[in-house]
Amino acid sequence: MVDVNELMQYERQLQEQGYKYICGVDEVGRGPLAGPVTCTAVIMPLDDLIQGVNDSKKVSKNKRIKLYDIIVEKAIAVNTVSYDNKKIDEMNILEATKACMRDAIMGLSVEPDIVLVDALKLDIPYKTMGIIKGDALSYSIASASIVAKVTRDRFMEEMAEKYPEYGFANNAGYGTAQ
């Protein structure tokens, strides 16, 4: 398991520069054939770190669910937005992802001083820092990735019950050999 302090490099540098409310934003659902793109923006307290936080793809499902509850409870502010297939088809997946991220950020109950984003450029009224592979390098982005992943997975589990013939319980909307 990665020590959560290893994910604090960017946040610590920004704190030293005087930034207080550091927002991480991430998305899930850009690659699947079905289901929404889901984006979460989160501002975490940086003096009370949650051990186990990491890129959602590197955390087991059970651990993600536990971390989700802790992140949502401890967050200074958190907001999740999902865009459905109609919105994605209307805009294209890249533009839908950017708009979804923007809406997640703009819906926060606390204004961020700076937004850390996983490599995309966003049109928002806040200073941004793009970090390639940010969900694996930034505590704030990793926290957002966990909340977004659990939220989307829960939605896809509901869809699996409603439409069992599509196998969403096993594939979460991603293409498989099945």
Give, region by region, the residue ranges found by the protein language model.
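RNase H-like, Mg2+-dependent phosphodiesterase core
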Residues: 1-178
